[in-house]
Amino acid sequence: MSSKQVPDTLTFECETGNYHTFCPISCVAWLYQKIEDSFFLVVGTKTCGYFLQNALGVMIFAEPRYAMAELEEGDISAQLNDYEELKRLCVQIKKDRNPSVIVWIGTCTTEIIKMDLEGMAPRLEAEIDIPIVVARANGLDYAFTQGEDTVLAAMANRCPEWIQNAQNNNDQDQAIQGLMSFFPLKNTKLSSEPTLLSNHPPLVLFGSLPSNVASQITLELKRQNIHVSGWLPAQRYSELPSVGEGVYVCGVNPFLSRTATTLMRRRKCKLIGAPFPIGPDGTRAWIEKICSVFGIEPQGLEEREAQVWKGLQDYLDLVRGKSVFFMGDNLLEVSLARFLIRCGMIVYEIGIPYMDKRYQAAELALLQQTCEQMGTPMPRIVEKPDNYNQVQRMRELQPDLAITGMAHANPLEARGISTKWSVEFTFAQIHGFTNARDILELVTRPLRRNLSLEDLGWSALVKRDKINLV
């Protein structure tokens, strides 16, 4: 395809206004594991229960820390008292599991029948003496990963208030330690680390990452003498970070715009608008932005990024010059597209269910900068794309790879287009310097499979002549 068929500038379009994504209640899959003392109660129909059982793949005897409050005809027709039914379930949860927090997840059905979960939660919380957080993760209003966004936004309101005096006391302790350094005492161990890492306002990072990935990112910032005061969500509900006026917050995922808004408007935090730490280029830009806000000169980031790119050379040789088409599912599309363009790929289109241009402004700027740096045409960004139109565009463009939701994968494969499920990028470890290889492992898997089939001479049997797309 010639570059004339691809826009030369970053263009934004909006098509149908419909969401074609995985259900947002799937956020329970990773959040119940992240918040170790939590219990998630999904209030919905049997359909929601079937989805969770199939998507999460957890057997009932494993006693996972989530459950379904199944709505029946009596609930929907208002013959049963919603409050009493939820109270019965929560009392049973407290007796069996005794969690530190219960998270109610609202679904499409609770929205349609106007169930007042927010009104019932404070009353029940006072009765059973367990915090109850209400999050609306319904598929009518939200896309796949925005389920996590609604949960974190609700938890942001439960974070303790940051007190300026605590920081002042910390500064006094450091001053005392500095004074005592002139009068060394025997058998006294004074660590200089807190002094080095606290010459800036408190920093809270928000976004659910596996513990090892969060530790890696915290360590990368520590190397720049930046101390992370806390993560939202924390591993335990009782360890939620203190937020408030004077606290800086920064997101690690592009789908957390609601959480960012809550932290800024309701908790008066200052948001650091940065690209997201996906890929070595994004991670470097993310750290550099935080350093610039705190007036810190970054050290060794250029060498660190170059070292990572060098380790990816075998994958880069495979993807260079290949084309990719994002149909849109998990709101990670812009960050992944930017990274793949930096790897030498051509991105024809970035479909995305929802785009908050303010929250993703730095990421969009880095995307445009990357396209100019690599000399590739800038992709068109289509918000709420119409799948029929997308299939027609793919028929014309014939990309080497389509990153799509599971519903479209098999039909596209049957028509000769290699696919990769977008949901795999959601559950994979893709953040930070060290996990860039995992992204390329996922992207190149269908490409390597095709090469293997050709080498074996089986392509004629497995992949017949391409059928015209309908």
Curated annotation (Swiss-Prot):
Localization, UniProt: Plastid, Chloroplast
Pathway entry: Porphyrin-containing compound metabolism; chlorophyll biosynthesis (light-independent)
UniProt key word Iron: yes
Coiled coil: none
Keywords tagged on the record: 4Fe-4S, ATP-binding, Chlorophyll biosynthesis, Chloroplast, Iron, Iron-sulfur, Metal-binding, Nucleotide-binding, Oxidoreductase, Photosynthesis, Plastid
GO molecular function terms attached to this record: 4 iron, 4 sulfur cluster binding; ATP binding; metal ion binding; oxidoreductase activity, acting on iron-sulfur proteins as donors; oxidoreductase activity, acting on the CH-CH group of donors, iron-sulfur protein as acceptor
GO biological process: light-independent chlorophyll biosynthetic process; photosynthesis, dark reaction
Cited function: Component of the dark-operative protochlorophyllide reductase (DPOR) that uses Mg-ATP and reduced ferredoxin to reduce ring D of protochlorophyllide (Pchlide) to form chlorophyllide a (Chlide). This reaction is light-independent. The NB-protein (ChlN-ChlB) is the catalytic component of the complex.
Protein family: Belongs to the BchN/ChlN family.
Name of the protein in its database record: Light-independent protochlorophyllide reductase subunit N
Gene Ontology CC entries for this record: chloroplast
Catalytic activity annotation: chlorophyllide a + oxidized 2[4Fe-4S]-[ferredoxin] + 2 ADP + 2 phosphate = protochlorophyllide a + reduced 2[4Fe-4S]-[ferredoxin] + 2 ATP + 2 H2O
UniProt xrefs under PANTHER family: LIGHT-INDEPENDENT PROTOCHLOROPHYLLIDE REDUCTASE SUBUNIT N
Matches recorded under Pfam families: Oxidored_nitro (PF00148)
Cofactor field: [4Fe-4S] cluster
Cofactor: how and how many bound: Binds 1 [4Fe-4S] cluster per heterodimer. The cluster is bound at the heterodimer interface by residues from both subunits.
Family matches, as InterPro entries: LIPOR_BchN/ChlN (IPR050293), Nase/OxRdtase_comp1 (IPR000510), Protochl_reductN (IPR005970)
The protein's assembly and partners: Protochlorophyllide reductase is composed of three subunits; ChlL, ChlN and ChlB. Forms a heterotetramer of two ChlB and two ChlN subunits.
Chief place where the protein resides: plastid
Gene3D superfamilies with a match to the protein in the record: Nitrogenase molybdenum iron protein domain
Provenance organism: Zygnema circumcarinatum (Green alga)
Binding site for [4Fe-4S] cluster: C23, C48, C108
EC number: 1.3.7.7
